Amino acid sequence: MAYVEFNGISKHFGSSVAVENLDLKIEQGEFFSLLGPSGCGKSTTLRMLAGFVKPTTGHIQVNGRDVTHLPPEARDIGIVFQNYAIFPHMTVFENIAFGLVERKLPRAEIKQKVDAALAEVGMTGFEDRYERELSGGQKQRVALARVLVIEPEILLLDEPLSALDKKMREEMKFWIKNIQNSVGITTIYVTHDQSEALTMSDRIAVMDQGRVLQIGTPVEIYEQPASRFIAEFIGESNLLDGTALDVDGAVCSIDIDGTTVTGRLTQNNAAVQGQAVTLLVRPEMIRLHSLDASEKPKLNGTVREIIYQGSVVRYRIQVGHQHVMVEVANRPDLARLDLDDDVEVYWNADSGVAIP
């Protein structure tokens, strides 16, 4: 039995549908992300689990117990929001101890638990500081420590990094995942940032318009997207429109502007001859050669734009009436291309994904 289960969960706000017929199973100790654009229903789903929002239909179970109609305080769930909610009139110690004081634990036990939580989040020595004396990342650590110290069954994180700058977000991604691994707590993470989900998650549920479109590991979601929407939403994508010529098992031959290429069909997709299909190839999977190269070409193209980004050089290549973006590592031996150079665009056979 899964540790957390959503069974047929829907949430309607009047005539507006926020979540529709949601089924999810999350294992104990798993880092599970709900990923999708704004308004897709991911935060509503999280708040239904926390008890702040009541489902219109369906049931939610935690460790075999139906919690659908329980108030938040009866669910043993901790939640961290993006705005931290640190009490400005309290010290770091007092903020972290707040939940323990409410539970009327002995003073010595409170100090022991708070000291342990401070050490866990790397904030030992900050006990007497106030909110105004903390950076954004430090505030987020305090908010997380305040939740972890009460030892909840489940940790919910609702876009906790969105208020931080890029450098701090990168640091906090790895820090949160390390903390989760260390504590072993079942964690459900809400984000619209695919990088956060790919970096930290054991599994991801991609949502749109109140529905789950695909559930899988980060590798499965990135390399085997179930739809064009997911291919576009997760990472950067080259999407080439074509027509299925032949299907042999999981391999689909595709006509793209008069050139035949192949793509692999993902597990849940099928195609038939003559059907319109989209070929997905990630920018980092594509290779370029000048037209006199010996490798067999996949598509012929012309360099239309060159973007220098330090560690990589990006080329926008026109192939027929479509374009692909190619990302090349910037090495000392890199053979630079110029605008309007004619090139061959190719990739490994298993790097192209056919999406009906």
Question: What is each PLM-predicted segment?
Answer:
Residues F31, P72-G78, Q82-F229:
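ABC ATPase nucleotide-binding domains
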Residues L35-P37:
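The feature captures the beta-strand-to-loop junction immediately N-terminal to the Walker
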Residues A50:
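Helix-to-loop junction immediately C-terminal to a conserved catalytic motif
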Residues T56-H59, E109, Q209, D241:
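Conserved coupling/switch loops of ABC nucleotide-binding domains, chiefly the family-specific signature
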Residues G58-D66:
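Conserved ABC transporter NBD signature motif
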Residues S237, V247-P356:
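Non-catalytic connector elements of ABC transporters
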